[in-house]
């Protein structure tokens, strides 16, 4: 019998994570002054979920959460940015191999590694994927979409760098450090 790739726990996390991402995306964002581009707290939450549940869950939480936000609050999804949100979760989820927050350790080395990974993830998603898909799918003007991508990417890097680091650090403090318990005789 094949081992199921997605556990019940992960599926529930994807559902709840997508709903929280949607709510944070709508009510936890600040406008940047660039049309349709906001400072989003949802990506700090996505980072935590991606590190906890891995790349597939990270992708699905970002993709489904962003799609739901667009559908519920704007009427239809902007698929290029929905896909980019999934890419952020996917790449950060691959970082779970290097950043084991469930082991109760999130010190300088892990903070540096997390921020390096999230900068790469946001750079790929917002500087490359979202604007390129905007041009290919929606025939949007080149200068507009790359400006939106750069502003969105930089704001997400800063938000995840600050809020994500604090959120993940606080979460890791709730975990028991590996090897910290001893058997009493």
UniProtKB/Swiss-Prot annotation:
InterPro entries: ECF_substrate-spec-like, UPF0397. The keyword Lipid biosynthesis does not apply. Its main location: membrane. Pfam families: ECF-ribofla_trS (PF07155). It is found in: Cell membrane. Signal peptide: none annotated. It comes from the Bacteria. This is UPF0397 protein CPR_1556. Keywords: Cell membrane, Membrane, Transmembrane, Transmembrane helix. One of its GO terms (cellular component) is plasma membrane. The chain crosses the membrane at residues 11-31, 44-64, 71-91, 111-131, 149-169. Belongs to the UPF0397 family. It is a multi-pass membrane protein.
């Amino acid at each position: 019998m094949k081992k199921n790739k997605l556990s019940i726990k992960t599926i529930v996390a994807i559902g709840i994570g997508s709903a929280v991402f949607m709510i944070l995306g709508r009510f936890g964002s600040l406008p940047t002054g660039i049309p349709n581009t906001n400072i989003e707290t949802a990506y700090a939450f996505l980072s935590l979920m991606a590190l906890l549940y891995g790349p597939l869950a990270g992708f699905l939480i970002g993709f489904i959460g962003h799609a739901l936000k667009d559908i519920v609050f704007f009427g239809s999804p902007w698929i290029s940015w929905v896909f980019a949100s999934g890419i952020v979760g996917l790449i950060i989820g691959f970082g779970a191999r290097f950043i084991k927050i469930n082991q109760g350790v999130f010190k300088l080395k892990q903070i540096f590694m997390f921020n390096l990974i999230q900068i790469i993830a946001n750079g790929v998603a917002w500087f490359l994927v979202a604007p390129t898909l905007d041009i290919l799918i929606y025939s949007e003007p080149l200068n507009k979409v790359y400006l939106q991508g750069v502003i969105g990417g930089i704001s997400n890097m800063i938000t995840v760098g600050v809020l994500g680091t604090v959120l993940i650090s606080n979460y890791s403090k709730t975990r028991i450090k590996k090897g910290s318990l001893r058997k009493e005789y």
